[in-house]
């Protein structure tokens, strides 16, 4: 199932900076009718509002709060493409006093946030024959030292993405799982990654992958190295139907 961004309405969580902001810009550059900017701080989208005018609509949303996401869905019933981009990640050793609190916080946003968004928008996306895009990571399939809790939360979100795809595909909803490597964002800088990919590589890749009807997207150079090694397992295990 494929969907073109042109003349469609999108919603992006965490739309005020980094990958989320780049997705908004790419969608509008490719002819999106309107993009909802779902953010915790509604004052953080002024730059996008000044640039795009009535093509963008800012809505308050917190993916760690179920009621907030339900309200968000009630205000965006015309949406065709929902991008769950909001996420958190901090360097954290597993062997530490505060690891449990840190891990729970990341699960609340990175894993349960996806569950909240998928549940809130499923009926709308079914009615509009739309798409759900989940920002996962190469850390979804490989645990990185000092990012172990982040990697585990993204592994959980990837597993959930597979389950969501199984449930939503029969309802004619396309699901796209995006797995970038380090991207030039505040999060990557804090983690000490160098030579990070430009945010536009991810956002432009999403536009193309949606049009192609793909399930996986490994958009940047490092991610493509993972894709090459992961492809056989993905084709034979992840996307296979073992119910037959």
Residue ranges and their predicted role:
Residues 16-17:
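Conserved glycine-rich cofactor-binding loop
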Residues 28-47:
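Conserved glycine-rich Rossmann-like NAD(P)H-binding loop of the short-chain dehydrogenase/reductase
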Residues 59-71, 100:
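The beta1-alpha1 cofactor-binding region of Rossmann-like NAD(H)/NADP(H)-dependent oxidoreductases
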Residues 89-104, 146-149:
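Conserved mid-core segment of classical short-chain dehydrogenase/reductases
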Residues 118, 153:
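Active-site helix of classical SDR
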Residues 137:
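Residue(s) in the substrate-gating loop at a strand-loop-helix junction
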Residues 177, 185, 189-228:
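C-terminal helical subdomain
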């Amino acid at each position: 199932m494929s969907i073109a961004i042109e003349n469609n309405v999108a919603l992006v969580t965490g739309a005020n900076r980094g990958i989320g902001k780049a997705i908004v810009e790419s969608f509008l550059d490719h002819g999106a009718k309107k993009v909802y900017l779902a953010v915790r701080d509604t004052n953080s989208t002024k730059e996008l509002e000044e640039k795009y005018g009535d093509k963008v609509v800012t809505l308050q949303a917190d993916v760690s709060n179920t009621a907030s996401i339900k309200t968000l869905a009630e205000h965006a019933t015309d949406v065709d493409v929902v991008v769950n981009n909001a996420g958190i990640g901090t360097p954290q050793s597993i062997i530490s006093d505060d690891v449990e609190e840190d891990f729970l916080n990341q699960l609340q946003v990175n894993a349960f946030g996806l569950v909240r968004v998928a549940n809130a928008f499923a009926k709308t996306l079914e009615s509009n024959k739309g798409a759900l895009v989940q920002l996962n990571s190469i850390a979804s399939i490989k645990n990185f030292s000092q990012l172990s809790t982040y990697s585990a939360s993204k592994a959980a979100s990837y597993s959930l993405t597979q389950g969501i795809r199984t449930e939503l595909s029969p309802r004619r909803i396309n699901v796209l799982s995006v797995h970038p490597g380090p991207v030039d964002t505040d999060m990557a800088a804090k983690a000490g990654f160098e030579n990070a990919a430009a945010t536009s590589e991810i956002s432009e890749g999403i536009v193309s992958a949606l049009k192609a009807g793909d399930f996986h997207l490994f958009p940047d150079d490092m991610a493509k190295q993972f894709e090459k090694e992961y492809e056989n397992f993905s084709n034979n295990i992840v996307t296979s139907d073992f119910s037959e």
